[in-house]
């Protein structure tokens, strides 16, 4: 798979729905292209979020990151990484770091004072990645959800 120097980071576009869906499955969130198209379309239209992809000439899209800016009452605005995945065959070669840099640049321009990410307690490799890239572990919490 590709080396870091050959990885290009760019804004995602609707035509990226298929590889984004495949990569989402590697993250544990399987989706068909038909399911991904409206999700990606909505994300691309949102002014307070950005989606970037990592691609190589030989392998196409090998990763993506989705980040959003959150205006908060209790603290200064911050960005949150909503999702980040690199193709299993391309991990630990720098693409994730480049995607994170693109998201951080976008967040700064959006007026965010910091960035946070939530990661499943079982994803030790991801935790190491975020620590390596300057994040600090600051909270353990329980997550709740409700269908609407």
Which residue stretches match the model-derived regions?
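Conserved N-terminal entry element of GNAT/NAT acetyltransferase domains
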Residues: 1-15
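Acetyl-CoA-dependent GNAT
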Residues: 11-18, 22-77, 87, 100-101, ...
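A short, internal acetyl-CoA/4′-phosphopantetheine-binding micro-motif in the GNAT/acyltransferase core
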Residues: 84-91
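Conserved G/P- and acidic residue-centered "switch" motifs that form tight phosphate/ATP-binding loops
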Residues: 94
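Conserved active-site alpha-helix within GNAT-family acetyltransferase domains
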Residues: 97, 121-140
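Conserved GNAT acetyl-CoA-binding A-motif
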Residues: 100, 107-119
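Active-site/acyl-donor-binding loops of N-acyltransferases
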Residues: 140-147
